[in-house]
């Protein structure tokens, strides 16, 4: 078993900047958890705290039910793969993979067995005698993975391991890592800023922003049921179209009442009854001045006549500004304010992206009809940016996400208040931070010195053993 529990984890740097706020997550054994978000959101810091490379300012970290806040990295039984591979250039692939085991004084026969087994899994058996400089980026990354596999750790930590690879190799390595996870049946925690990597690899995904957790869920749930505007915009390529300052309006009364979303000029679309039934506290929004944001994914906007004929109440007119032919599909960038002569580069509130058939016959500046799939639209509160739609029977329920599915992230206003509050630092705090920083430098220097001495000692012992073996052979 190799589960992890993070309870109220916070990270505050000596400067007073808080990088992670109240991070809580229960990671089950054998899960593939992906931490995803834009640069600076705290995902790598969280991973480094799990590894023990960053001190936890407050909160508790448990591995297999054991509190490990004060346990040094080498005793946590975890292995980490870095973005830059971190291979020793003067050592062969074999020696790079075996180095950690040699430091632990594992017998030679077992080292040889584990290195060759890992090399077989990763398909690098033919490269064991080569130096890192003779390998491609993908091969180096496999060696870095192999070095962690031979240790047989409880948990694998991967910090943006594919970011240095080209697009084709990234796609290939995504598959390799997913296969490796299935084969090893071990807990993986993976950090990336690439939502495609997150969606294709993770059993659950943690979306982060500005140090705060936003949503913890399965890839499909994140796509279909984003909890707020940020998650909706971050997950999906191209990103979701947003129409702000929209309102819910009704026409008719009683059973004949129809509910529409009114947005941008005179555009409005009819909401199906199933969507209306999901709106939380609908009386707060319907026929009031309270604004909402309408979200529509590009793939839920249709240009084919058959769909338009069946959904006449969701049709809008738009002018085509850019056409991107991608072979299997075509992406069009449209201007909803089609009567204006030119679209604004600065103000994109009237612009949207649609995915249509690659067979569609269209031209630049054409004014065309587009129909929204109203069954798959998203509605968000105009102020808090939280979704105002309840989940329906399509929501994927899994036992691992019992707590995560109930998590409610802070609003942008609450996040800003906490960030500003964390930046208030007194003179006494600054003095203590400087003292802690000096102590941390001394500790790090001592650790580096000890590691270097251990490496030299291991190398010396290995040479001594080799000399003894040669002397025995000579005798």
Indicate where each model-derived feature is located.
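Conserved ABC transporter NBD signature motif
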Residues: 59-67
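Helix-to-loop junction immediately C-terminal to a conserved catalytic motif
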Residues: 51
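Conserved coupling/switch loops of ABC nucleotide-binding domains, chiefly the family-specific signature
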Residues: 57-60, 110, 210, 377
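Short coil-to-beta microelement around the adenine-binding A-loop and adjacent beta1/P-loop entry
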Residues: 16-18
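The feature captures the beta-strand-to-loop junction immediately N-terminal to the Walker
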Residues: 36-38
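Non-catalytic connector elements of ABC transporters
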Residues: 251-475
């Amino acid at each position: 078993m190799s589960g992890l529990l993070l309870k109220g984890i916070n990270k505050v740097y000596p400067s007073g900047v808080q990088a992670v706020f109240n991070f809580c997550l229960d990671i089950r054994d054998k899960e593939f958890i992906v931490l995803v978000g834009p640069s600076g959101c705290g995902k790598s810091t969280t991973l480094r705290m799990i590894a023990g490379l960053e001190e936890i300012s407050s909160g508790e970290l448990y591995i297999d039910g054991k509190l490990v806040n004060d346990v040094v990295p080498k005793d946590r039984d975890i292995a980490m793969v870095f973005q830059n591979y971190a291979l020793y250039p003067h050592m062969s692939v074999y020696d790079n993979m075996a180095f950690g085991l040699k430091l632990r004084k594992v017998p030679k026969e077992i080292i040889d067995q584990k290195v060759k087994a890992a090399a077989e899994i990763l398909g690098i058996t033919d490269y064991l005698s080569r130096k890192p400089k003779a390998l491609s980026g993908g091969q180096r990354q496999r060696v870095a993975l192999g070095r962690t596999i031979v240790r047989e750790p409880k948990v694998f930590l991967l910090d943006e391991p594919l970011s240095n690879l080209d697009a084709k190799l990234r796609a290939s390595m995504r598959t390799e890592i997913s296969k490796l996870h299935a084969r090893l049946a071990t807990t993986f925690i993976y950090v990336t800023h690439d939502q495609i990597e997150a969606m294709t690899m993770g059993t659950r995904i943690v979306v982060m922003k500005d140090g705060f957790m936003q949503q913890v869920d399965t890839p499909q749930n994140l796509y279909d049921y984003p909890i707020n505007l940020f998650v909706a915009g971050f997950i999906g390529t191209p990103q979701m179209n947003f129409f702000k300052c929209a309102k819910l309006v009704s026409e008719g009364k009683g059973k004949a009442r129809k509910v529409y979303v009114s947005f941008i000029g005179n555009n409005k679309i009819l909401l199906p009854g199933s969507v209306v039934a999901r709106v939380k506290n609908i009386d707060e929004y319907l026929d009031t001045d309270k604004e909402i944001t309408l979200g529509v994914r590009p793939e839920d906007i249709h240009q084919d006549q058959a769909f338009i004929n069946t959904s006449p109440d969701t049709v809008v007119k738009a002018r085509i500004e850019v056409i991107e032919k991608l072979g299997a599909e075509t992406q069009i960038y449209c201007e909803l304010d089609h009567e204006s002569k030119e679209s604004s580069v600065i103000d994109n509130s009237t612009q949207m992206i649609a995915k249509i058939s690659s067979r569609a016959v269209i031209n630049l500046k054409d004014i065309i009809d587009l129909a929204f799939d109203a069954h798959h639209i998203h509605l968000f509160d105009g102020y808090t940016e939280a979704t105002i739609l309840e989940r329906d029977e399509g929501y994927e329920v899994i036992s691992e996400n019992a707590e995560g599915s109930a998590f409610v992230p802070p609003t942008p206003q609450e996040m800003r208040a906490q960030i500003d509050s964390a930046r208030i630092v007194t003179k006494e705090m600054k003095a203590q931070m400087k003292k802690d920083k000096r102590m941390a430098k001394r500790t790090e220097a001592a650790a580096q010195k000890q590691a270097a001495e251990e490496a030299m000692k291991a190398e010396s012992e290995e040479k001594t053993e080799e000399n003894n073996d040669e002397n025995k052979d000579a005798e």
